[in-house]
Amino acid sequence: MDKILGASFLVLWLQLCWVSGQQKEKSDQQQVKQSPQSLIVQKGGISIINCAYENTAFDYFPWYQQFPGKGPALLIAIRPDVSEKKEGRFTISFNKSAKQFSSHIMDSQPGDSATYFCAAS
């Protein structure tokens, strides 16, 4: 029984190290750059957050919203064949030639206070 438990622990440890190594490689390459780092907007204002990418093979560009103590949730996403997509007060704009996409929140509300981040894959 001890040998089986020891083997299970070793497999789990190796998987965690592999995942950790993968994350380091991705962070070293910095797949996307988001700006600004923080943003203060008055109620009713427009929030604009930009994201730039380098890899032209990417074909999916999501924005996520994360409230304190919660996991990230997909807010809106776009593909390169569409220049703009709207969902309620949220708009995502895509500029393929500039290799960037932007998130716009119209009529910002106090309930919109959260962490927003972009991704590309």
Swiss-Prot record:
Glycans are attached at residue 95. Gene3D superfamilies: Immunoglobulins (2.60.40.10). One of its GO terms (molecular function) is peptide antigen binding. It holds the Pfam family V-set. Its main location: membrane. Residues 1-21 form the signal peptide. GO terms for cellular component: T cell receptor complex. It is found in: Cell membrane. Keywords: Adaptive immunity, Cell membrane, Disulfide bond, Glycoprotein, Immunity, Immunoglobulin domain, Membrane, Receptor, Signal, T cell receptor. Disulfide bonds join 51-118. GO terms for biological process: adaptive immune response. Residues 30-121 form the Ig-like domain. This is T cell receptor alpha variable 23/delta variable 6. It comes from Homo sapiens (Human). The lineage of its organism: Eukaryota, Metazoa, Chordata, Craniata, Vertebrata. The gene is TRAV23DV6.
